């Protein structure tokens, strides 16, 4: 059994954050909330999503796992206004998710979770540098880099965090000192990342006041931020692009 009611804009943002990684997911539903762990088909990006029961206006659930087509639910939520309430229900033993929004009632067929890629193991990484910055600053730097190159260098040098992109003839670089950041833990960090992934991953951060980046040298980057006034969290782990000498 699962019954819940949640703000439409919050649900849209949560689904959009997952959809940048995969099209289909296994939702783990528990009395304390919902969680998803998924990795993209190329094994380059991983998404970790948690939404506690306090993020919902109403929430009641037994432990279960369901498979969802994110494209279907994204299309369905497209008709909802930002202040609408989305009501969802799942009866025990049913493979249909009932959704009410904007005066419309939908019956959404669920996917068999066993046909969806299994939940990945989250690697334990020792990332020496940590940067906390405003989400809009991160998004701005990535958008600027897109116009120059297909990859971006991110690192920490002393008390400065930098993001840099180089093309054949052009270059863009953003430096932020300790006084321009929300927080900085200095450490040896310099890694190159694909903008094909970064561009989509940072889209949800535009509305976020604090984004935490954990970095190393030629290591994955962990991008972590809260949603739903702290009742939820989204984390991305993105593998670096290693260039041969």
Swiss-Prot record:
Keywords: DNA replication, DNA-binding
Gene Ontology molecular functions: DNA binding; DNA polymerase processivity factor activity
Superkingdom as given in the UniProt entry: Archaea
Keyword DNA-binding: yes
Keyword GTP-binding among record annotations: no
Annotated InterPro entries: DNA_clamp_sf (IPR046938), Pr_cel_nuc_antig (IPR000730), Pr_cel_nuc_antig_C (IPR022649), Pr_cel_nuc_antig_CS (IPR022659), Pr_cel_nuc_antig_N (IPR022648)
Pfam families named in the record: PCNA_C (PF02747), PCNA_N (PF00705)
Gene3D superfamilies: 3.70.10.10
Alphabetized CDD domains for the sequence: PCNA
Membrane-spanning segments: none
Record GO biological process: leading strand elongation; regulation of DNA replication
Subunit field text: Homotrimer. The subunits circularize to form a toroid; DNA passes through its center. Replication factor C (RFC) is required to load the toroid on the DNA.
Similarity section: Belongs to the PCNA family.
Primary role: Sliding clamp subunit that acts as a moving platform for DNA processing. Responsible for tethering the catalytic subunit of DNA polymerase and other proteins to DNA during high-speed replication.
NCBIfam families from the UniProt entry: PRK01115.1-5
Name of the protein: DNA polymerase sliding clamp
Lineage: Archaea, Methanobacteriati, Methanobacteriota, Stenosarchaea group, Methanomicrobia
